[in-house]
Structure formats: structure tokens, C-alpha cells
């Protein structure tokens, strides 16, 4: 079994607002994600799902424990290595798409590659962005602004943007949270399609049992503990 993500005894806590107590978000979490797999972490709002994903994505720091991604320890990376990791090793999809309103769909997809760490430039970058939009069925929207397309389409653009630098891991934080059931189903189908065709490892957090059931494996996070469901 080739491991993409390996987490050992990972914990996250922070002081309460009055500073008198310690709030434990999750406690000594262990998780192994196989390369090319799709995994859902499901749980109620406030259970720490997004915090766990942020820690894996190096958007937040753990209190203790270790994380390895592609057999690289994330505990001692330099600031430059952290930036490269966020931009190249992992791709992020959030509940809110955060598309730039004054940029076209095509330009939005290219943004991460233009941030300084992408390997493609010029026509090669444009061609890759166009191909990604074709794969998600939006190559007819290249010159549209985000406000000119539907909410479901905007979230699919966010998926294409997350893949522009060819990451090995896709981290999705409640990606269907702002969508109706029809568009939610379409987005989950798209994520599974990309997981199968591109071999990108998919780790998704969601409060939806229905969405979690579409992944190959599912874990439940509640009361600070992570338990495998299947």
C-alpha cells in the first residue's frame, strides 16, 4: 500500500476566550490515506473537521503529532517549502469558491500557477487551464465572469483552479455546502471522476452522510475522536 497521507497522534487545542480552560478540537488522531483513494471525514458542525483539513493543508498548526504527505514530514518545513506545498502538493476547494469577480473563468483557473510556484507559463498554462475547463464541461465559459455563471458552475471552476498545478492531493472543505441537491450530486460525481481519471488523492470533509457515502472510505469525527466507518 502506497501512502499519500499519514497522520500520527495529531491533536489540536486552543485556550478558551476567557483563557481559563483549554478547548480540545481533536485528540491524538491517526489516519492513513492510500495514494489515489477518496476519503470523507464526516461529522456535525463544530466537530473540528475543517480544522483538521486546515492542519493537513498547513493553513493551521497542530498542537502535537506528526503529518507526512508523500513521505515528506510537514513538521520542519521552511516558509518557502510551506508555500510550495500549499501551491503544488495540495489543491484546495472550499465551500465558498472565492473566485475573483473581475477576472474571467479562464483567468481564475490560472491564478495559482501565476502565484510564483507553478511550472507552466504563457500558452502552456493557458492550454492546461482550457483543457481542465473542458474536462469539467465549462470550456464554453472561458470568457465569462464569475457573476455570469451559476453557483454550481462557479464551484466547478474552483475545482479546476485547485488542479491547475497538478497536485497529488485535493483537499475539499464542505465543497457542496452552498449548493442544492442536484448541483451537489454533480459536483461529487465530478470529484469522483477526477479521482479515478487523474489518480489525485481526494480528502473531503462534509456534514452530509449522502456525500460521504460516495467516497471509497469514510471516517466520523466527533467529540475529538476520529473513527473509521468503512
Kindly label every feature range from the protein language model:
Residues 1-2, 230:
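Short, Lys/Arg-enriched, disordered terminal segments
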Residues 4-5, 10-221:
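ABC family nucleotide-binding domain
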Residues 218-230:
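H-loop (His-switch) and adjacent beta-strand-loop-beta switch element
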Amino acid at each position: 500500500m502506497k501512502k499519500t497521507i499519514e497522520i500520527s497522534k495529531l491533536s489540536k487545542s486552543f485556550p478558551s476566550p476567557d483563557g481559563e480552560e483549554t478547548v480540545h478540537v481533536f485528540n491524538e488522531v491517526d489516519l492513513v490515506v492510500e495514494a489515489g483513494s477518496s476519503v470523507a471525514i464526516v461529522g456535525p458542525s463544530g466537530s473540528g473537521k475543517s480544522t483538521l483539513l486546515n492542519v493537513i493543508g498547513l493553513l493551521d498548526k497542530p498542537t502535537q503529532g506528526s503529518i507526512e504527505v508523500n513521505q515528506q514530514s510537514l513538521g520542519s518545513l521552511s516558509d518557502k517549502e510551506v508555500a510550495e506545498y500549499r501551491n503544488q502538493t495540495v489543491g484546495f476547494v472550499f465551500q465558498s469558491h472565492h473566485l475573483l469577480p473581475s477576472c474571467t473563468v479562464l483567468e481564475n483557473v490560472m491564478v495559482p500557477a501565476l502565484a510564483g510556484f507553478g511550472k507552466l507559463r504563457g500558452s502552456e498554462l493557458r492550454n492546461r487551464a482550457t483543457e481542465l475547463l473542458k474536462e469539467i464541461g465549462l470550456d464554453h465559459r472561458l470568457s465569462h465572469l464569475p457573476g455570469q455563471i451559476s453557483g454550481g458552475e462557479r464551484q466547478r471552476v474552483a475545482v479546476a483552479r485547485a488542479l491547475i498545478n497538478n497536485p497529488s492531493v485535493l483537499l475539499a472543505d464542505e465543497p457542496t455546502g452552498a449548493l442544492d441537491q442536484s448541483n451537489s450530486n454533480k459536483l461529487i460525481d465530478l470529484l469522483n471522476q477526477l479521482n479515478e481519471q487523474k489518480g489525485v488523492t481526494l480528502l473531503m470533509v462534509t456534514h452530509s452522510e449522502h456525500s460521504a457515502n460516495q467516497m471509497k472510505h469514510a471516517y466520523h469525527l466527533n467529540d475529538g475522536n476520529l473513527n473509521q466507518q468503512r
